[in-house]
Amino acid sequence: ITVLRPSGGSARVLGLDVVEQANEVRQAIGYVPQERAIDRFLTGREHLQLLASLYHIPKDKAAARIDEVLKLVNLEHKADEVARSYSGGMKRKLDIACGLIPDPRVLFMDEPTLGLDVESRLKIWEHIRQLKARGITVLLTTNYLDEADQLCDRIAIIDSGRVKAIGSPNELKSGLGGDIVTLTLASGDLDKVEALAQAVKGQTGVKAVSTKQNVLDIRVASPEAALPAILGAVTARGCRLEFVDYHRPRLDDVFLAHTGRRIKED
């Protein structure tokens, strides 16, 4: 933001135009990149001191600000150790601390938990929740739909550069309507999948059907009402079932409905 001129359209951050008021926008935002911007030979504190000087923060205020963000991301005990001794989760915490040095009102985070183990991911989630509680607006990009569901007040589903849907997690999921019935056919019945899908589409209460290899995802108004007819279609076509499941709509179902594919395929 503010580095490259947009090829079209307009954007505002906190009511500020990113082209006409670029300096004011830069003063209001922080950024945590996807690729770690860590120098392994510097300590955590030295990283923050360098950034504080680049932001022209006076030394007396910088020291207090550095201590504050180190405490916020729980890195005080490692602040004076070189970054090469940090674990992956600690390096990500340092990235977040760097993004917080200018005391931003809006923090942009690009894939904040990419490549982290489960424990480290959960810790980063907790730090993001703390930022929200402090009144910081966090805008994050993620391919982890459970992460978006857990952390976000509003979600935009973007496909090929276009916003396909936007709303709260509950709004997006309830907007699909009904439940999802998933049928997994025996691998030897791949040639029957499309014919079965067409037959199921004609059943009462079936809203939509999508297929992926030997799996059918069927959106229905009521699983209890639709399942007998669906299973009847399976039997009539001599298909062998390996697994049957149904669940309330999840964000991956929302993504599938708006893009035609599941996010794990990308």
Regions found by a protein language model. Give the residues of each.
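ABC transporter nucleotide-binding domains
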Residues: 1-165
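A generic structural signal for secondary-structure junctions
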Residues: 14, 30, 56, 95, ...
